[in-house]
């Protein structure tokens, strides 16, 4: 069966190469205004090199990796695809269609300009397989500066979570919600791995979310601190938190109902769309006292097994994405942060500059679990912590016991 699939894919690739060697089919799931504007930065760069960009855009939240592999095995694969999951690259390798990029990045001298978390995220089984295009920190705190002033608090001065929680009474006394939280499973899941990095540090985080999780950390002091901290956050959730979308939650902070939100820093797109300015209307900090921050890296892959002409065009795409100026322009359009530490900063807002400052410390960053860990294990953690979040009577011991049981079932 594998031989017949591979034969069909190879034949399709040969036909497409003969028809138009520099027409690249680009597969992605970006469709919002800022996302399309950012894509156009890449498209302009690719077309400046003499190539053609043909779009395959699918809706968000449709299982994009499944659809991608359906195209590949169906004999109509894209040349370039937006995909971070390491499993997809392993599947392509099994079909003989992976395209390692280690040699390209090494020859271009690009890797030295990426934060360590980016290099880790784009590496699959020892090879550079992805082209990083944007960075988001999963656990940034965005706060309304007017609300902070009215409440008499300064989030930028918080040096610990205890200091943050201690100021919340001042915020309540001033008539505001201290912390806006969207009570959906994925939002709680993202908060958990952000807190795992912040309270447990890189070693604990890697043991829990690495490629080979270490069961000894499941019942550790760090895990107990993580769950106890999560309970404190749950107790701060307002009455309307349950099942609230993240962007609706962000709007509560933008409109001055709440002081702050801790979430992925794609929140910034909502602030920008509302005409707000970083450093003037809103501030951004990492989780107070954080020992590390988890980093999401939006990345592209390219397909192997193609003609020299198409392969060269794909590498031109990689060069465009990796260009420092393109990185800055892309980030400015999308509301993200460049993956290169040497990207020009004059077009970046205050929050992107702060993210790059944080990422200068190689020991202070860890990759998003979706880029490293077994998907079943990650999903099982989400199930347990969301049950813990939703049921205030569930104890830390109960949660740990469930996580241990899941480990034995999935990885034991």
What residue spans do the PLM features occupy?
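Long, aromatic- and glycine/proline-rich binding clefts that accommodate carbohydrate-like moieties
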Residues: 282-285, 331-383, 387
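Extracytoplasmic/periplasmic solute-binding protein
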Residues: 128-133, 165-212, 258
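Conserved N-terminal structural module of periplasmic/extracytoplasmic solute-binding proteins
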Residues: 8, 19-90, 94-95, 242, ...
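Extracytoplasmic/periplasmic substrate-binding proteins
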Residues: 29, 194-197, 228-310
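Conserved C-terminal helix/tail region of periplasmic/extracytoplasmic solute-binding proteins
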Residues: 45-48, 73, 149, 363-412
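Extracytoplasmic/periplasmic substrate-recognition and gating elements
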Residues: 22, 44, 48-49, 149, ...
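Hinge/lid segment of periplasmic solute-binding proteins
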Residues: 84-139, 191, 279-281, 350
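Glycine-centered hinge/linker elements that transmit conformational signals in sensory
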Residues: 166-168, 210-242
């Amino acid at each position: 069966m594998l031989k017949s699939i591979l034969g069909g894919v190879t034949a399709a690739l040969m036909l497409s190469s003969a028809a138009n060697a520099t027409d690249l089919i680009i597969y992605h799931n970006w469709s919002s205004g800022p996302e399309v504007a950012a894509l156009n930065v890449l498209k302009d760069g690719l077309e400046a090199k003499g190539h053609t960009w043909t779009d395959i855009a699918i809706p968000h939240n449709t299982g994009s990796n499944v659809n991608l592999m359906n195209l590949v095995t169906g004999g109509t694969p894209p040349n370039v695809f937006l995909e971070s999951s390491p499993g997809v690259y392993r599947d392509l390798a099994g079909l003989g269609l992976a395209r390692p990029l280690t040699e390209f990045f090494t020859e271009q001298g690009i890797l030295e300009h990426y934060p360590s978390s980016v290099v880790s995220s784009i590496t699959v089984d020892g090879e550079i397989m992805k082209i990083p295009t944007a960075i988001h920190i999963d656990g940034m705190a965005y706060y309304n500066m007017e609300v902070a002033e009215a409440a008499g608090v300064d989030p930028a001065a918080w040096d610990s979570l205890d200091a943050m929680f201690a100021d919340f009474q001042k915020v309540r006394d001033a008539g505001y919600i201290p912390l806006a939280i969207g009570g959906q499973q994925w939002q709680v899941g993202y908060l958990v791995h952000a807190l795992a990095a912040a309270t447990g540090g890189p070693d604990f985080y890697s043991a829990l979310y690495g490629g080979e999780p270490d069961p000894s950390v499941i019942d550790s002091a760090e895990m107990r601190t993580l769950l106890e901290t999560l309970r404190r956050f749950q107790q701060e959730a307002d009455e309307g938190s349950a099942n609230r979308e993240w962007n609706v939650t962000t709007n509560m902070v933008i409109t001055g109902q709440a002081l702050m939100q801790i979430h992925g820093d794609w929140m910034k797109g909502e602030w920008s769309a509302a005409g707000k300015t970083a450093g003037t209307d809103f501030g951004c900090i990492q989780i107070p006292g954080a020992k590390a921050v988890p980093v999401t890296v939006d990345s592209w892959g390219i397909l192997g097994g193609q003609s020299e002409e198409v392969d060269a065009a794909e590498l031109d795409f990689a060069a465009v994405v990796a260009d420092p100026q393109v990185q800055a322009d892309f980030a400015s359009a999308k509301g993200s942060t460049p993956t290169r530490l040497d990207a020009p900063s004059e077009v970046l807002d205050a929050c992107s500059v702060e993210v790059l400052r944080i990422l200068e410390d190689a020991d202070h960053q860890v990759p998003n679990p979706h880029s490293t860990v077994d998907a079943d294990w990650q999903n099982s953690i989400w199930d347990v912590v969301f049950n813990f979040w939703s049921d205030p009577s569930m104890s830390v011991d109960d949660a740990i016991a469930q996580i241990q049981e899941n480990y034995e079932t999935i990885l034991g």
